Amino acid sequence: VHKLRAWIRDDDGLPVRPYLMLVVSTEDGKFLSCQPGDTVETALGGNIAKKEPSSETVLNFLKRVMTHPTQMNSSAAGEKLAPSRPKTIKFADTKTAALHLGEKEKWADETACPYVQGCKDALAALGVEECHFAPVPPMFLENIIRGSIEPGMAPENQEYGTQHLPGLMECTDGFTPEFGKSLYAAAAAYVRASPWESLAARRPIQFTYRLVLREDVSMKLTAFGSVVGSKDAGSYGFSVHKTLETAMKAYDLEHTGDGEDEANAMAAGGQTCMFTSVYETPFEDVDNAELYGWEIAASDGDAPPAEENWPLFCKIQFEKGENGEQDTLSLTRPAIIELQCFELMFKGVVELLNGGELKSSGDAVRDAAGPWTVKAQTAAGSEKGETAEVELEISLPALTSDQAGTFL
């Protein structure tokens, strides 16, 4: 029972991620489904559910597969097969698909997959002799689910989007569930602090701290962060630049642009964390946040609680088109050291905002202020939940200086 990385419309027209109920015969490799009936009890909807299926839904589907089976993976897809009853049924779901891989001796006693206990007694009454857990081979997940089934569920006109970027855990060396929890909590606190109410858009904030992620590096790092957009504008986040020069370029483009301020500011490059909807968030990040309990700031208004405020961390490279060619904007995911910078900056900004110290807007927007010293915990590189304390020196540089910082 797998939660697919795709969006479809539910009966109310709202986007939902569907669930696939896929039956595989281990004797002959057939992918089995059923002829859907016209009632819930006869597997109305077939092998796709628009919400997480209950044990009762899965049981109804399995009964229908036994009595009205069809084969999916053949040249005659949808071909009706003779009714049959298996001796053994092994279950897995999205959260348990990788559990105990290569540890077959643990499968029979594992109860983490809810469908084992939820269907066991009813299946026994039908004559199914064994019902227990078994993980899903990674190659099956990648080749069949990811490579074949999910692409077939995407709308024909769907363009490439940020939801198809690789997940942070999947593409960033050193990114652990513990660091994800700390990073997402810091991002959620940043949203709740509403920094755009106290700080002008793209106004550079200087951060200096000593790197603790790598023992072989003891240098101090300086980088420049700034608030991007606002809730009222409908686009909001945080950007990081390596030097004051590029941070100032983004600031000037933001405030002297021709109305396309966000696109203009992006032309200055850098790294950004924009807060977006769950529908635009990489599927792997969404699944990991759900699996490991990463925090998302509550949505505003009538939106579902976890629909908005998802942090999307990207490195931006903007290339201006020449000779009439179209401008291009490429997105990649930051490295662990760069993500740690976001984690620490979020925590530093929130502490100073909550204390009423960090303000820069209006006539005083170009004035220098600080420095302030803030101590923050980082979980970058953590595998067992341990953290390290980092001392941040935070200041508002005067916006007339050509000082540049260094960033690793």
Give the ranges of each region predicted by the language model.
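Secondary-structure boundary/capping micro-motif
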Residues: 1-408
